[in-house]
Amino acid sequence: MDTRTSMRIGQPLAAMAQVDADDPDAFNHCFADVNGIRMHYIDEGQGQGPLVILLHGFPYLWYMWRRQIVALTKAGYRVVVPDQRGFGQSERPDAIEAYDMSQSVGDMVGLMAALGETSAVIIGHDLGAWVAQAAAMLRPDLFSGLVMLNTPVPPRGKVKPTVGLQAMAKGRVYHHLYFQQLTKPDRELAADPRKTLSSVFYSISGSAVGAERWRLFVEAGEPILNAFTEPKGAFPSWLSPRSLDYYVAEYTRTGFTGALNYYRCRDRNWEITAFLDGAKVSQPSLFIGGAADPSLEPVEIRSLYDQMDAYLPALRKKVLLPGVGHSAAEESPAQVNELLLEFLEQLMSGDPTSEPAAG
């Protein structure tokens, strides 16, 4: 039974290239019953070319991909962009284990079925890259290519993620560990969503300098928001007031608990995936990051980028965009769009060309 519903609020598809991408109502908003939850997603370019699925990270929403939706649809692709479970207008289950990787990948498999599609290129940013990589690894029959933005997701390690992160933190608290606490980070982030989001978006971007930049580690007992700084004056032009307002309105409505539950499943994901020891992603892949992304500063994280081709043997290219931080798709949409379209064109044409994976 088709359980999808669709509502085009804004412009017809043919006019998408002319719309204000910052207007969330300019896109085709849909809902489907997927893997036991009600999922919200954007669906543009129905009935045209190959399917591309875009997965957001934290603290983002489908909306972070707004400029990619327009560019990819204009280029002839069907573009589907969900709010992942726990985010935005998608359902937010209460149980922490409802956010483990088996459920997240199950959501993508279920979404494909609801769409009536059998093949897609999957693209993920930040924690969306965790889901995208796992989906590509577990279901190569469905996902023909993989793109990760900003977060180099490692293969399954020999120890639980929490153990490795504690060693990296050297007595301090890495943000993943902070977010694993119950209720405390939820309350702190939700106390003033506008301050939270403006501080996070600015500090993790390439626009922040010096002491404004995101501190990945806080001291024991220090509030996580001390690691971020609000911009002085107007926000940089890559995030308009209208865009910030949309993020703030959604997180004010939903809170942060669903999103934080992904971090609370880090060890659980490791525990349930022993069968992935030594597994690699064999499909063609691409990595796009920011040279000014604070998240790449720890040597342990940077080494994942440097050694990426070891576990992505079909890596076509890895790129660090100069002056760009952790929000590459928003900070530098033209460059990101160009790289995505180049990769997709090669993939769809069957071009085996592979540049040296250097950035």
Indicate residue ranges for each PLM-predicted region.
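Catalytic active-site module of serine/aspartate enzymes centered on a nucleophile-bearing elbow/loop
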Residues: A314-G359
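N-terminal targeting or regulatory segments adjacent to alpha/beta-hydrolase or S9 domains
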Residues: M1-Q18, A357-G359
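Conserved beta-strand scaffold positions in the cores of enzyme catalytic domains, especially
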Residues: H29-F31, V79-V81, K317-L320
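Short, hydrophobic alpha-helix immediately C-terminal to the catalytic nucleophile
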Residues: R66, Q133-M137, N337-L341
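Flexible "cap/lid" subdomain of the alpha/beta-hydrolase fold that forms the substrate-access gate
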Residues: I9-F27, R38-M39, E44, L51, ...
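Conserved HGGG/HGGXW glycine-rich cap/lid loop of the alpha/beta-hydrolase fold
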Residues: R38, I42-E91, H125
